[in-house]
Amino acid sequence: MPELNFRAIEEKWQKRWLEAKVFEPNIKDKPKEKKFYITVAFPYLSGHLHVGHARTYTIPDVIARFKRMQGYNVLFPMGWHITGSPIVGIAERIKNRDPHTIWIYRDVYKVPEEILWTFEDPVNIVKYFMKAAKETFIRAGFSVDWSREFYTTSLFPPFSKFIEWQFLKLKEKGYIVKGAHRVRWDPVVGTPLGDHDLMEGEDVPILEYVIIKFELKEGDETIYLPAATLRPETVYGVTNMWINPNATYVKAKVKRGGKEETWIISKEAAYKLSFQDREIEVIEEFKGEKLIGKYVRNPVTGDEVIILPAEFVDPDNATGVVMSVPAHAPFDHVALEDLKRESEILVKYDIDPRIVEEITYISLIKLEGYGEFPAVEEVQKLGIKSQKDREKLEQATKTIYKAEYHKGIFKVPPYDGKPVQEVKELIAKEMMEKGIAEIMYEFAEKNVISRFGNRAVIKIIHDQWFIDYGNSEWKEKARKALARMKIYPETRRAQFEAIIDWLDKKACARKVGLGTPLPWDPEWVIESLSDSTIYMAYYTISRHINRLREEGRLDPEKLTPEFFDYIFLEEFSEEREKELEKKTGIPAEIIHEMKEEFEYWYPLDWRCSGKDLIPNHLTFFIFNHVAIFREEHWPKGIAVNGFGTLEGQKMSKSKGNVLNFIDAIEENGADVVRLYIMSLAEHDSDFDWRRKEVGKLRRQLERFYELISQFAEYEAKENVELKTIDKWLLHRLNKAIEGTTKALEEFRTRTAVQWAFYSIMNDLRWYMRRTEGRDDEAKRFVLRKLADIWVRLMAPFTPHICEELWEKLGGEGFVSLAKWPEPVDEWWNEEVEVEEDFIKSLIEDIKEIIEVAKIESPKRAYIYTAPEWKWKVYEVVAEKREFKSAMAELMKDEEIRKHGKEVAKLVQAIIKERAFDVKRIDEEKVLRESKDFLEKELGLEVIINPEEDKGGKKRQAIPLKPAVFIE
């Protein structure tokens, strides 16, 4: 057979689907009970989609196709997300001829150079990648209703008006507030940064440091060294301070809330703190070594402690000033031990080494399993020798901090006897009330980079608009909705619950980037994670909106909040429709149809997306739905999928390690890509794309095509007399139908592929071996039935070649709309499956015996089946499932009693292996019917149950595991 031209087949069926509008559902076709509405997070168009994205979009398409074949009226729409600063940032970097950005777009995304330079205008980036993404989705065979396509921002006014309506509703309900809040901030562009505005670091948490002001006296002047800590309670155990002698520090006037103080902090800290409600005026710059050997006063205990040198202090983390608590901090203990050994460092700074030798550790916390100084014990336990054992030190620190926080009891008055987690809050609060401590926000890691290419800082913003996800009543509604929803996989539910609990105010607008202006404060633009939470409702009416736009019959400015209120929130009213016709210019009957569509499709059945969107988009999706819509319109389910890697490496466009989705289709064909992605991992697990494996799957798919093409020529004559092996294949087909259906209902796409493709392929291979040389009507009937079912089972995964094969099979219409297979009652036959498994297992056992025993030139296989009394033992044990009662019952049988010890051993073995569901078959009959096949497969003469007990093997036979002797 010539090599299969996947591209030609794909183009043929994509064209036919679009021409016939196969995937544009009509709500008049089926009752609401038979509707199925599924959506996936629309892609952000700052570049080409890669094969990781391919998985996110293929999963819902497979489910949509499956439900369509089950007889549901399926809506699977698509739109495009272009909101925010990333696209503007890319345009800016291309304008500035940033080499790395140009390399990504020219070499990784393969944008022609003459088009690349037009990307200085962000609108051209949007147009180019929107066209490319749609082409990719069509080429992938996605069953999208393109009549509902739209994109975000004020560039598409109807959707922008919908977002204005959403925000007016949120504000009306008190969920949008104005105030001060900490946000990620691009200090160059001057804008807050949402998750989607970051090139790197979207998962990096913001830490809240307590900075404690240790006092340094210089003449009459009081200068503060603010030490940053995540453990304010340990201020009682400070033995010294750490400063990096090689880092640059500044003396600065710090003004905050009408109060002015002089601080010494790292140069980097001065910059960061200037964004956090402080005016910083640098007076002097110097190296940290200037401070070494000086003494500062602990503002809580009054102790004077020495400043010691430590190169481990990172000036770019918090204030660059660190307090040392060696009893409870492994790093501090090890650093002091290193200084004791390397006293020449101290001498360099005119510090008497005896000062460090005589430092006394202060025990603060009682911790079960540890003595006075937990940090010291943990360091000894892990065999840490010096600060160079950084990995072990990190481990020790995590262990001690976690244990002390969760189980530690504080020992120092006035907090003695209280749990550490309670004391931590009390001490921090008390210090701040006294003015000896403040808060500083810092990223847990440094790699937080905006899409403009700038390193982010944390800024306290005033007069910023926020969505108040911390509102307790709103949280309660979100929890109620989540409790009613299906979550796939269910293991993700706890994560959603936790996020609902900790979610707080979130900045919802910025002053740069593409988007929809806030309706009441238009200098602010709604950001990308805030305008993408309820657009699934907009899809339900977008077909009508698009048609009106194309016909020039729509004035978006007339799409007032009143219009959206009626469509999405109110009851049907002919009077209201007539009123709105006058106000909007939209005919009343079309307004009525829009409302009908919304009421038909809502609630949304499934929302699909990658697991990275659980902490933001997917949780915001729940919150915004419960805020705006009636309870009967709250979403019903969320399905989450994992990530993709490429040849074992994380995909990264910035490193060029990325495979564009469209390139994967070009190289392999859409059906190969789809099947490969679906076969690699269950939806929540991560997958790894390997080119070699893709090639192997392509050949298997070509074999599938070849087999169905061959079987299409057979005639499926009914009422033929089937042989046992024919019945076996039909039974296995029933199992494949059942297995595929169940897996797809639960979004377990890998299991579905195992059943729909590999299981049938393996069963067919076995059937062809068992029926070699046969070409009768029964075989042709079975293979023709298999072809008809197999093509339909595979259609959600490989729709193009299945359409082609369906046509060859003479199927009616499109396979995409064909009836999903259902098991045929009369095909069920567990007995024949047990019989075939028995034969397969026997062949494997005999081959293994020959190999292990290294039998050269074997001639004969003597096979002994289990005697009747052993079957009885299995049946009794299956009923009793307990040794004593089974033995008591068995010993009533005179025949069985003769085999006393053997019976006891067999009962113990059955119970140990829990082999309670062994199905009885006539082993000898099965063997005699399969004798010719066994001899051909094994190349041996097969002798069944001879009188002679060859090699004394006979007694080893147990049900479904015959004894075998080879000679």
UniProtKB/Swiss-Prot annotation:
Q: Which GO terms describe its biological process?
A: leucyl-tRNA aminoacylation
Q: Where in the cell is it found?
A: Cytoplasm
Q: Where are the transmembrane segments?
A: none
Q: Which Gene3D superfamilies match?
A: Class I aminoacyl-tRNA synthetases (RS), HUPs, Isoleucyl-tRNA Synthetase, Domain 1, leucyl-tRNA synthetase, Valyl/Leucyl/Isoleucyl-tRNA synthetase, editing domain
Task: Report motif location: 'KMSKS' region.
Answer: 650-654
What's in the keyword line of the UniProt record?
Answer: Aminoacyl-tRNA synthetase, ATP-binding, Cytoplasm, Ligase, Nucleotide-binding, Protein biosynthesis
- Provide the E.C. number(s) assigned to this enzyme: 6.1.1.4
Kindly report, in one word, the top-level EC class recorded for this enzyme: ligase
Q: Which Pfam families match?
A: Anticodon_1, tRNA-synt_1
Spell out the GO cellular component terms annotated for this protein, sorted alphabetically and separated by semicolons.
cytoplasm
Which SUPFAM superfamilies does the entry mention? Anticodon-binding domain of a subclass of class I aminoacyl-tRNA synthetases, Nucleotidylyl transferase, ValRS/IleRS/LeuRS editing domain
Query: Highest taxon of the source?
Result: Archaea
The yes or no answer to whether the keyword Protease is present is no
- One annotated GO molecular function: aminoacyl-tRNA deacylase activity
Q: Does the keyword Nucleotide-binding apply?
A: yes
Positions of ATP binding: 653
Q: Which coarse location class applies to the principal site listed for this UniProt protein?
A: cytoplasm
Name by which UniProt lists this protein:
Leucine--tRNA ligase
Q: Which organism is it from?
A: Pyrococcus abyssi (strain GE5 / Orsay)
